[in-house]
From Swiss-Prot:
Heterodimer of LeuC and LeuD. Its cofactor is [4Fe-4S] cluster. This is 3-isopropylmalate dehydratase large subunit. The gene is leuC. [4Fe-4S] cluster binds at C357, C417, C420. Residues 429-441 have a biased composition (Polar residues). Catalyzes the isomerization between 2-isopropylmalate and 3-isopropylmalate, via the formation of 2-isopropylmaleate. Binds 1 [4Fe-4S] cluster per subunit. Residues 429-451 are annotated as: Disordered. It comes from Mycobacterium sp. (strain JLS). The lineage of its organism: Bacteria, Bacillati, Actinomycetota, Actinomycetes, Mycobacteriales. GO terms for molecular function: 3-isopropylmalate dehydratase activity; 4 iron, 4 sulfur cluster binding; metal ion binding. It catalyses: (2R,3S)-3-isopropylmalate = (2S)-2-isopropylmalate. Its EC number is 4.2.1.33.
Length: 481
């Protein structure tokens, strides 16, 4: 097949491969393109009205074989064999079960061996593959872009449109390259990279763009790390985030339940290798970071862009030139109960949460276990370790990680979104402060009046041991036995 004369970015290639019909018109008056959707992920919160719309129009689900559902946002992470106590949560879960049964959609319910957070079960089952278009009624669908897929969150009306037609009307996005080159210092993770990126470009810096993460530091990451980075693309305002598929991607997918096999596998890998951005392709925007200059990162405010290195201090709003940003910082410090100039390492927490679609994978749990091994959670600190899926939970238990967590004084939970958001029993009380491996630190995100600091799994574990925001480098060595 002849290559187009104009070099294309990866996002442009995937888009072009999925255009069912081009929109007509020019400029701002141009109609959207109609894009085919390869994989539709569904959960209990954003789908009920979409299914109701199908019923009212007497429409079936167009491709139930390309639609998969799970229960994650509202489910409890303890006593999962008992009825859900909260009536709203219980109704949403029961409604999803009825809808999936009626419309013939595969569902992984609470307690199922493959149940878990929607953005963790897709990749672990091999459903998410390079070059796909993936949608879900959830902001963090961008996670799947780590495989070289064009993945984005959609609203409830769009969920209904995809259920009915397996297509979505979309306008082309702008493209942004975030280049992270060099070698990461010891103790610096994918979570630190993405928090630094968002702090650099702001929560609106990627608005209207698909971000492609590039450079030697990105290429050195595992698939789990790449998923962490793409997961938080939306926190920079981007529509999606992507990483070019490579041998790391292919080895992750090889042998998974829905991955191609035999000759189909060989053909798929050959096609996937062609997705990489062409030499000479131009991005609308480019951003550069030197990996060697990065360090463990934490947030101090109430949006993911309000972050500083752990070695730094709470910023002084008076030094912020932009009036809007200054006012936002003042408001954030009031809500967070922090004083300008306070060293981040002096900020004490009540709770530590490890989990979410950002950092609830087996690699994340191994990092936490390495820090906690032979140590204890500090007095007065509550630590929740919540696997992102039942498969992750089973793997962790087969490796004995659960015993390390429990022996250290942490709570080992069932799979679910848990304390990432205040839609289930795992919530902060007003005024409580949490070091969290999740993706959002908005006011009340983890419970009304709760205060959230976004951190990496390693920082979360060290914080649990010391009781203040810390990295493993701050801990005393474990005595030899």
């Amino acid at each position: 097949m002849a290559q187009p004369a104009t070099p294309r970015t990866m996002a442009e290639k995937v888009w072009a491969d999925h255009v069912v019909a081009h929109g007509t018109g020019e400029g701002a008056a141009r109609e959207p393109d109609l894009i085919y959707i390869d994989l539709h992920l569904v959960h209990e919160v954003t789908s009920p009205q979409a299914f109701d719309g199908l019923r009212l129009a007497n429409r079936p689900v167009r491709r139930p074989d390309l639609t998969i559902a799970t229960e994650d946002h509202n489910v409890p992470t303890v006593d999962i064999d008992k009825p859900i106590a909260d009536p709203v949560s219980r109704t949403q879960v029961e409604t999803l079960r009825r809808n999936c049964a009626e419309f013939g959609i595969r569902l992984h319910p609470m307690g199922d061996a493959e149940q878990g957070i929607v953005h963790i079960i897709g990749p672990q089952l091999g459903l998410t593959q390079p070059g796909m278009t993936v949608v879900c009624g959830d902001s963090h669908t961008s996670t799947h872009g780590a495989f070289g897929a064009l993945a984005m969150g959609i609203g409830t009306s769009e969920v209904e449109h995809v259920l009915a037609t397996q297509t979505l009307p979309l306008r082309p996005f702008r493209t942004m390259a975030v280049n992270v080159d060099g070698e990461l210092p010891p103790g610096v993770s994918a979570k630190d990279i993405i928090l630094a990126v968002i702090a650099k470009i702001g929560t609106g810096g990627g608005q209207g763009h698909v971000i492609e993460y590039r450079g030697s530091a990105i290429e050195s990451l595992s698939m789990e790390g790449r998923m962490t980075i793409c997961n938080m693309s939306i926190e920079a305002g981007a529509r999606a985030g992507m990483v070019a598929p490579d041998d790391t991607t292919f080895e992750f997918l090889r042998g998974r339940p829905h991955a191609p096999t035999g000759a189909d596998w060989d053909a798929a890998v050959e096609a996937w290798r062609q997705l990489r951005t062409d030499p000479g392709a131009e991005f609308d925007t480019e951003v550069h970071l030197d990996a060697a200059e990065l360090s463990p990162f934490v947030t101090w405010g109430t949006n993911p862009g309000q972050g500083v290195p752990l070695s730094g201090a709470v910023p002084d709003p008076e030094l912020i030139v932009d009036e809007g940003e200054r006012q936002a910082a003042e408001k954030a410090l009031t809500y967070m109960g922090l004083q300008a100039g306070t060293a981040m390492r002096d900020v004490a927490v009540d709770t530590v949460f490890v989990g979410s679609c950002t950092n609830g994978r087996i690699e994340d749990l191994r990092v936490v276990a390495d820090v906690l091994r032979g140590r204890r959670v500090a007095d007065g600190i509550r630590m929740l370790v919540v696997p992102g899926s039942m498969r992750v939970r089973a793997q962790a238990e087969s490796e004995g990680l659960d015993r390390i967590f429990i022996d250290a004084g942490a709570e080992w939970r069932q799979a679910g979104c848990s304390m990432c958001l205040g839609m289930n029993p795992d919530q902060l009380s007003p005024g409580q402060r949490c070091a969290s491996t999740s993706n959002r630190n908005f006011e009340g995100r983890q419970g009304k009046g709760g205060r959230t600091h976004l951190v990496s799994p390693a920082v979360a574990a060290a914080t649990a041991v010391r009781g203040t925001l810390s990295s493993p480098a701050d801990l005393s060595a474990v005595p030899a036995r």
